[in-house]
Amino acid sequence: DVTAQVLTVKSFPLSIDFKGRIEVQGEAIMRLSVLDEYNKTADEPLKNARNAVAGAIRNLDPKVTEKRRVEILFYNVNYIENGDIKTQEECVEFLKNSGFKVHPFFKVCKGISSVMSAIKEIEFNRKTLDILTDGAVVKVNDFSLRNSLGATDKFPRWALAFKFEAEEVTTSLGSLLSQFKL
């Protein structure tokens, strides 16, 4: 149970105007600038933002989560009592209007060329973003069409992930020590 840890996340609204049961879905992140700032004073610097977030949420001490300044970007409403959300666009608007933080790159596209242009825009801008991103997810906007398309055992047929080429870095090997046992 990570409830205590999540309650320390400033981007997680502790109350919303909607009166009823709701289940939302999001992704916990650490901004790269926050990681850099944290590492300047940390006894043990964190290797990367993804591991930092996972460790902060799984940690038994909520103060660790709070100190790492984790954020949550929400992207889906899995269930809404007496709600009538018909599209992903309406879903994101509901989340924003309810005080949930959403990813700034959400975009509704019309046609394949518009989709491909949006993917290229994200890939082009990814180095300037303050968050890690390794790709883009394209989803069918209309929920009734999503239901018609269904899913396989593992994945929805109405969503497609585009992964960007991995970023590579070069490092120098300072020394090499070989040991053999005979």
Language-model segments: residues:
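RNA/tRNA-interacting regions in translation and RNA-turnover enzymes
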Residues: 1-182
